[in-house]
Amino acid sequence: MTEKHTTPDGLVIVDKPSGFTSHDVVAKMRGIARTRRVGHAGTLDPMATGVLVLGVERATKLLGHLALTEKEYLGTIRLGQTTLTDDAEGEITGSRDASKVTWEAIDAGVAELSGDIMQVPSKVSAIKIKGVRSYKRAREGEEFEIPARPVTVSSFAVYDVRDAVADDGTPVLDLVVSVTCSSGTYIRALARDLGAGLGVGGHLTALRRTRVGPYKLDGARTLDQLQQELTVMPVADAAGAAFPRWGVDARRARLLANGVRLEMPEEYTGVGAVAVFDPEGRLLALVEEHKGKAKSLAVFG
């Protein structure tokens, strides 16, 4: 008799390896979990490693509502060289001796790129310009501009400055940095803009995401580890950790299950998605307050 496989549903926090696109990780997880119902929240460039949040089965309903607005990174910025992609994946487009750049100048440049700033995303990115991905336009040699957009860099710190020599013999500086920023911030663009401000050019040579919203690297698993043992955060636990919790009695749970829009307590007004639980602790739905009543965003019960 064939054993029936049951796929656990929940969030999976993956430590993405370098060289994988976010979609590659989703495809790998579909094989590990033996289900097509896998999605991801947020994207990491192929070169980058670190935290990538996946949803399996019913948890895919949570992904679009998770508040993953703040992210943390560790990275290395090379001053003295520019590349087509603003990172080490692209061909070098310019080299300039960076050995005379001082700590004081670097600190001043970092300060200029901290706080609420306007940032022009990297041209080789997934941003659409008139319906076409900017990376496609860039690879076809098209000249175009991407509008600057507001981002918040709440922390940008340099931990070490190392003298180095690039492959073409150019004296360069490698900066070990940490960044805490809002969603939509390009660390590659920070590297590019820091180098430009210092007059020597710059690009990102390494990047590791250590946190996305409440999900940290110490809770992440590699794909090899997940292949050995699929570790998921159950849907109810994930929702309870990510959203305000609203416990309802059995009567209101039945009404909600039947599609009735319940009156919501005032404390949930304007807070966004709220996780609704029945008296037994079962996750029933994600709702948001709309004109005093619960509007369903996703139903689980």
Swiss-Prot record:
The active site is at residue 45. It catalyses: uridine(55) in tRNA = pseudouridine(55) in tRNA. InterPro entries: PsdUridine_synth_cat_dom_sf, PsdUridine_synth_N, PUA-like_sf, PUA_sf, tRNA_psdUridine_synth_fam2_C, tRNA_psdUridine_synth_TruB, TruB_C. Keywords: Isomerase, tRNA processing. Pfam families: TruB_C (PF09142), TruB_C_2 (PF16198), TruB_N (PF01509). NCBIfam families: TruB. Responsible for synthesis of pseudouridine from uracil-55 in the psi GC loop of transfer RNAs. The keyword tRNA processing applies. This is tRNA pseudouridine synthase B. One of its GO terms (molecular function) is tRNA pseudouridine(55) synthase activity. GO terms for biological process: mRNA pseudouridine synthesis; tRNA modification; tRNA pseudouridine synthesis. It comes from the Bacteria.
